[in-house]
C-alpha cells in the first residue's frame, strides 16, 4: 500500500513538472508584439501607399520592386 501511494505521488509530481515546462510555450503573453510571420499573412499589414492609392503587397506600378500579380487594393474606406 505504501508503494502505490509513493508511485501515485511521484506521478503527480512528474505531471506538474512537465505541465509547468510546456505551459509557457503553449500560450505566449498577450502583450507580446506581433511577429514578422503574423504580419506576413495579414493583408492589412501589407498595404502600402503608392502615390495616393493603396497597393497590395508593397508593390507600386512605377517601382523597381514590382512583384508578379500586383493588383491595386481597395481603399481603406471601401
UniProtKB/Swiss-Prot annotation:
Family classification: Belongs to the teretoxin M (TM) superfamily.
Processing and modification events after translation: Contains 3 disulfide bonds.
Species the sequence originates in: Terebra subulata (Chocolate spotted auger)
Record's signal peptide: 1-21
Name this polypeptide is given: Teretoxin Tsu6.15
Tissues where the protein occurs: Expressed by the venom duct.
Protein localization: Secreted
Molecular function via GO: toxin activity
Superkingdom field: Eukaryota
Major subcellular location class: secreted
Keyword vocabulary terms for this entry: Disulfide bond, Secreted, Signal, Toxin
Residue ranges listed under propeptide: 22-47
GO cellular component terms given for this protein: extracellular region
Entry comment, domain topic: The cysteine framework is VI/VII (C-C-CC-C-C).
